[in-house]
Structure formats: structure tokens, C-alpha cells
Amino acid sequence: MYWLLRIGVAIEYLGHGWAGLSRSRAWLPYYDLFGISPEAAVDYLMYLTGAVDITVGLLVLFFPLRIVLLHATVWGVFTALLRPAVGEGWWEFLERGGNYGMPLALLVLVGGGGWSLRRWFTRADAPTAVSDRAHVASHWAARGGLALLLIGHGGFAAFENKAYFYKYFAFFGLDRGTVDAANLMTILGWFEILLGVAVLIRATAPLLWFVLAWKLLTELLRPLTGQEIFQFVERDGDYVLPIALVLGAGVYALARDRLRQSRPTT
């Protein structure tokens, strides 16, 4: 699970950095929020943002300092919060659940850094021993992130009628009139929302494998319908988290049961 999360976080940041170097116009409102002009954003700051994100991805992959994992988590939350801050809605924040849930799960798994500043600047290599509390907390960070991204993506369809969803349906030969007449957008949205709730309630292996297949299909529709490939790459948490939860299920169950047994009885 450690290496899966580590590689996943690295790819997430490499993909996000790629978007910055590509000077994605979708980022302009986020810079405008801080009074930065479109010209300055496109000519300078997008390159800087992209370069920093790529550096973070490479550091996580080759030299994973704990402080870098903390940055990855905080930056994931911050960039996700920018979406509702510029009026894009809270579903956007939820849909980025993998962007902050995945690095948080990794940070918790390696034990964080505690109150020691020096420890934060040490490598977060694969731990030889992980406490039961850390196993359980890491599991829930990953599970919560996966549930949120499913619920957020479902909200796009059920409540916001995102225009690019019609392109997804068109890819399968369904025009807008058919989609609206059959309420397919609402059905799809609520299906994903309920899928996210199901992950929170009982994350069984069959459910998680289905979620993996579902997210691979729905996110591959982005490049297949004309969106930039980095939109698929930077959402690798959508695919890494269900695998991580399946692989770590046994360890999580043992840790959870030991913690329950250690609680004092009244």
C-alpha cells in the first residue's frame, strides 16, 4: 500500500504540473482571485506553479521528505478549495477528494512528523512498523477521499448538468434530447453519489473493483471527448485509492479489531 500511494501521489503532481506548464486557461479564475492578471498568470505564474508541482511529484517519487508529503496534502486541499471560492461550487471540492485524500493517507501511514521540525525534513521511506491507529487512520483517509470524489462527480451530473457530460453520452450515441428526456444525467449523478455513500458504509472488495473499473471508464472519457490528457492523469487517485483499499483491507481489519479489543469495557 505504501508504494502504491507513493507512486500515486507522484503521478498526481506530475499530471497537475503538466497542466500548469500547458497553461490551462481553466486556471485563470484562481489567479484572478488573488488579483493576478491573466497575462501575468499565463506568461509567468502558470509555469512556476507547474514547475513546483512537478518538483513535488519527483521528490515524492525519489526523495520523499515528510514535509513534502505535508505540502502535497495541504496544497491538494487549497487548490480544491479554490473551486468553490471562485463560484464553481462545492461539488468541485468534493470531486478532488483523491487530490488530498491520497497524500494524507500516505502521510499518516508513514507516521507524519509530529512536533519535531527536524523529523519533518527526514525521508518518509516504507515504515518497518505501523501502529494500529495509523493503519486505521490511513485507511479512512483513503476511503474518505474515494467516497468524496465519487459523490462530487455525481453532483456534477445530478445538480449541475455539466456540459461535458453530454459529450460523454454522445460518445455512446446518445444525443442531448435523449439524455434530457430520459433523465439520464440525474440517474447517472445519483448512481455515483450512492456509490460514494456505499464506499463509506461498507467498502467490500467487489465494490472497490467495480469503482476502479467505473472510474477508469468515466475518466478515460475526458481525453476521448477532447479534454487534455492531463485531466485523466492528475486524477490518478480515482484509480489508485480503490486498489490501495483492496490491498490494505486485511491489515486494516486486523488493526481495527485489535483497537476495539483494547478499549476498556464498562
Cite the ranges covered by each PLM segment.
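Perimembrane loop-to-helix junctions flanking transmembrane segments
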Residues: 28-42, 168-179
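Functional cleft and adjacent loop/helix regions within the main domain
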Residues: 165
